[in-house]
Amino acid sequence: MENLKKALLEQFDLVFSDETLLETAFTHTSYANEHRLLKISHNERLEFLGDAVLQLIISEYLYTKYPKRPEGDLSKLRSMIVREESLAGFARDCQFDQFIKLGRGEEKSGGRNRDTILGDLFEAFLGALLLDKGVEAVKSFLYQVMIPKVEAGDFERVTDYKTKLQELLQINGDVEIAYQVVSETGPAHAKNFEVAVLINGRKSGQGQGRSKKLAEQEAAKNAFEKESSSCF
């Protein structure tokens, strides 16, 4: 905790009044489950709160920044900014991956590098910051960490692999592409979906994500890479 507090102070000039909130934000369910007798809180509830305030602040920013863009374009851009992969990247930028508390099994299986865990951690931190400092503090933090990348156009260039896969396969004539949910795990506010992509009934790729759309994109990316190598 001391190293985390030092990092937040040095990087963002942040000092939490309620250190319990900060500790909870960095505690994964696997760690809490391994220490049940200590009745340690995990970060899922804070993640739920952080997701909501993140959506609000990014939505307000995009609405103000791009007054002539239609709702559909704004929604697509927002989804790219707040998707699991992006949030995990922001968590790594902030070096949050160094401080999360994981259970031994999760640690051994590579949980510290898993996008799902890091994306959830980033949202949980925002939830803790909201409760401790208020919405303006969250906004200030996001404007330091996220907005510069948005303004640099990083999320305008995100590849739509579902479209790329369709275009690749249609070179050889009509094909049937279907996306099938393989599994759905986690609590209602933090679902994790696993989706397979079928090409003419043949499984070609699989992906995971916090929404069906994100999982479909990951599956399409996996399939696109396989089909590209077999076509050329």
From Swiss-Prot:
CDD domains: DSRM_RNAse_III_family, RIBOc. Residues 5-134 form the RNase III domain. InterPro entries: dsRBD_dom (IPR014720), RNase_III (IPR011907), RNase_III_dom (IPR000999), RNase_III_sf (IPR036389). The keyword RNA-binding applies. It is found in: Cytoplasm. The keyword Protein transport does not apply. Its cofactor is Mg(2+). Keywords: Cytoplasm, Endonuclease, Hydrolase, Magnesium, Metal-binding, mRNA processing, Nuclease, RNA-binding, rRNA processing, rRNA-binding, tRNA processing. The active site is at D51, E123. GO terms for molecular function: double-stranded RNA binding; metal ion binding; ribonuclease III activity; rRNA binding. Its main location: cytoplasm. Residues 213-232 have a biased composition (Basic and acidic residues). PROSITE patterns: DS_RBD (PS50137), RNASE_3_1 (PS00517), RNASE_3_2 (PS50142). GO terms for cellular component: cytoplasm. Mg(2+) binds at E47, D120, E123. It is an enzyme of class 3 (hydrolase). Signal peptide: none annotated. Its EC number is 3.1.26.3. Digests double-stranded RNA. Involved in the processing of primary rRNA transcript to yield the immediate precursors to the large and small rRNAs (23S and 16S). Processes some mRNAs, and tRNAs when they are encoded in the rRNA operon. Processes pre-crRNA and tracrRNA of type II CRISPR loci if present in the organism. PANTHER family: RIBONUCLEASE 3, RIBONUCLEASE III. Homodimer. NCBIfam families: RNaseIII (TIGR02191). This is Ribonuclease 3. It comes from Streptococcus sanguinis (strain SK36). The gene is rnc.
